[in-house]
Design a protein with these regions (language model features):
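A short, compositionally biased
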Residues: 2-5, 57-60, 77-78
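Short, compact, well-ordered microdomains
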Residues: 65-98
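Short acidic DE-rich linear segments
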Residues: 100-102
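Generalized protein targeting/export and membrane-interface segments
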Residues: 12, 21-23, 78
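Long, hydrophobic N-terminal alpha-helical segment
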Residues: 1-15
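A low-complexity, Ser/Thr/Gly/Pro-enriched, surface-exposed linker/loop concept
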Residues: 24-56, 90-97
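Short hydrophobic interaction/assembly module
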Residues: 45-74
Length: 102
C-alpha cells in the first residue's frame, strides 16, 4: 500500500473514509477497525466485521496524526472503526487556537 498525499482510502469493515494529508516517513500500514484500509475504488470484502477492541470510531472533518511515523490523514466520512497504524491507535489532532484579533 503506497500512502501518497491526496490518495483516498476506505475501511474494509465500516463506513470510514480518509484522505492522506502527510505520508508516513517510512513504510507503514494504515488500518481501520482492525483491518488494513483499501483503495477508495475497491469493493469492500463480504463477511468481515470490526475487530474487537477497534470500535472507538472516527469523525468526519477531523485530522488523525501519528507522531512516530509522521503520517496525517483527514477523515472524510464517519465510521465505527478505530484508525490505527500497525495496530497502534492514532488520535485526532487538536484544533489550533487562533490568535485574538482586535
Amino acid at each position: 500500500m503506497e500512502l501518497k498525499p491526496g490518495s483516498r482510502w476506505k475501511s474494509a469493515v465500516c463506513d470510514t473514509e480518509v484522505v492522506v494529508v502527510r505520508p508516513p516517513k517510512a513504510e507503514a500500514s494504515l488500518e481501520c477497525g482492525g483491518y488494513p484500509v483499501i483503495a477508495h475504488a475497491e469493493a469492500r470484502p463480504e463477511g468481515k466485521a470490526i475487530a474487537e477492541g477497534f470500535t472507538d470510531g472516527s469523525q468526519a472533518g477531523k485530522r488523525y496524526a501519528d507522531e512516530e511515523t509522521g503520517m496525517e490523514v483527514l477523515c472524510t466520512k464517519t465510521g465505527q472503526g478505530t484508525l490505527t497504524i500497525g495496530g497502534r491507535p492514532i488520535g485526532a489532532k487538536e484544533a489550533k487556537k487562533l490568535p485574538a484579533s482586535d
